[in-house]
Amino acid sequence: MGQKVHPNGFRLGIIKYWNSTWYANKKEFAQYLNSDFKVRQFLASELTKASISRVVIERPAKSIRITIHTARPGIIIGKKGEDVEKLRKSISLIAGVPSQINIAEVRKPELNAKLVAESIVSQIERRVIFRRAMKRAVQNTIRLGAKGIKVEVSGRLSGVEIARTEWYREGRVPLHTLRADIDYHVSEAHTTYGVIGVKVWIFKGEILDGMMAVEPTIESITPPKTQQRKGRK
């Protein structure tokens, strides 16, 4: 009945990577999983303005290595690396093991579904007209080379009494093609008249020969010591 599988989970292990890459026995698995959850929760609360697109956690030899993909690395690193060092110490206390933090810069945030969704959420919370925010996001993403994008908002749009859903799409967004590199994220805008949901799908192209998706817009940083359519439901 029109229900869609999560595009990222659908492609996991085929063209998408896991966000946590470690192995554990039965006794340690729950502990590691809980530790990962607390670390991600801590980073989300501490780095709300850093435009974080992804956090990858690895656990080599009784330590934890965290790679933060961000569009604003300067906010995380801080002056002479002071902020990232404080962050490292806090994560070591939460995880209970020595930690290492790597920063990877997202060169084109307009091609990242999470950052696009958060941008739309921020504009809606600042009372920007939702249609304008959606159209601007679609235009910027297509201009930077995406093959297609779909943006959907739902809730009490513009404060009306009855909730509804509106969406814009430009280009192709083939959700059932496993080799299609689809980036997806859902976010929420908290307004005075309720919560508005924002969903973003971005089609970056097809990945052939069973190769895993590699984000071309990311560069590691070592801290110092077609046609537009409109729809309504």
Curated annotation (Swiss-Prot):
Domain KH type-2: 39-107
Pfam families per record: KH_2, Ribosomal_S3_C
Organism of origin: Baumannia cicadellinicola subsp. Homalodisca coagulata
GO BP annotations listed: translation
Family under the similarity heading: Belongs to the universal ribosomal protein uS3 family.
Secretion signal, residue range per the UniProt entry: none
This protein's name: Small ribosomal subunit protein uS3
Gene Ontology CC: cytosolic small ribosomal subunit
Organism phylogeny: Bacteria, Pseudomonadati, Pseudomonadota, Gammaproteobacteria, Candidatus Palibaumannia
Superkingdom classification of source: Bacteria
CDD domains (alphabetical): KH-II_30S_S3
Subunit structure: Part of the 30S ribosomal subunit. Forms a tight complex with proteins S10 and S14.
SUPFAM superfamilies attached to this UniProt entry: Prokaryotic type KH domain (KH-domain type II), Ribosomal protein S3 C-terminal domain
PROSITE patterns referenced in this protein's UniProt entry, alphabetically: KH_TYPE_2, RIBOSOMAL_S3
GO function terms (MF aspect): mRNA binding; rRNA binding; structural constituent of ribosome
Keywords associated with the record: Ribonucleoprotein, Ribosomal protein, RNA-binding, rRNA-binding
Biological role: Binds the lower part of the 30S subunit head. Binds mRNA in the 70S ribosome, positioning it for translation.
HAMAP family per record: Ribosomal_uS3_B
NCBIfam families according to UniProt: rpsC_bact (TIGR01009)
